[in-house]
Amino acid sequence: MFSEYKSTKKAGPKPAQKVEQVYEYAVWWLNQRGYSVSKLKEKLTRKTDNPEWIASVIEKLLDQGYLSDQRFAETFVQSRCRLYGPKVLTQKLKLQGVGTTDIEHALCTINDSDTDELISRVIAKYSGKKSIRDITMRLKSEGIDDTRIQSVLSSNIDTEHESQLATRIINKHAKKMGRSGLLQKLRSEGISQDTIDELFSEESKDDVIEDDQHKALEQLNKKYKTSLTDFAEKKKATAFLVRKGFSFSEANYAIEHHLEDL
């Protein structure tokens, strides 16, 4: 009997018998941390299903200054503005049920030093891993002003940042990809043309062609273990190499010398 009683007992706080108990319950939660009006109402529905009591308690707390969406929004923003940009903060506050006017007022309390710290944190996180373009897009998605982004970027990132990222990309893909594919990959990752030109400035054109021809041949030999005898097979082989980032001339060289030294 006892076990059956335990399993059916309603979880949550003891239901309020009078409005004063709802008020005390609300004050207890506000002493734990700040709440928006909307979220505190949700808490109070656990104590009572009487909407008039809830409305009365909320009104009393607002009149006493214990409850304020404006103050909640300001505190929320100040505690998180070095972690999130305005767009994300706005989304989070809307989920708390805070209105647009209070959100806009709270966002106005963010100063430039807070924003600069957020930008610097994102730069440090992605330095050498993401291009300047991608970092800029990431910050813009947070709702940070482009002028502020560029100001901090110019003092925190130099060409060495892109060179490190480009070198990582090259080292990862160079053995399996031709020069045209590498260039396309670098550009798609937001690496500037100046950085690309600098990295490849000391290579001779003939050496590049020869190296890419041999890489294309190596990839083809791994993929196709038997001779390519008809046009359809050669067409598929060419498409395979082009997808790998090799040019048509490099693909033709590989097909011509396929399995030659094996």
Curated annotation (Swiss-Prot):
GO terms for biological process: regulation of DNA repair. Keywords: Cytoplasm. The keyword Cytoplasm applies. Its main location: cytoplasm. It holds the Pfam family RecX_HTH2. Gene3D superfamilies: Winged helix-like DNA-binding domain superfamily/Winged helix DNA-binding domain (1.10.10.10). GO terms for cellular component: cytoplasm. InterPro entries: RecX_HTH_2nd, RecX_HTH_3rd, Regulatory_RecX, WH-like_DNA-bd_sf. It is found in: Cytoplasm. Modulates RecA activity. Belongs to the RecX family. This is Regulatory protein RecX. It comes from Photobacterium profundum (strain SS9). The gene is recX.
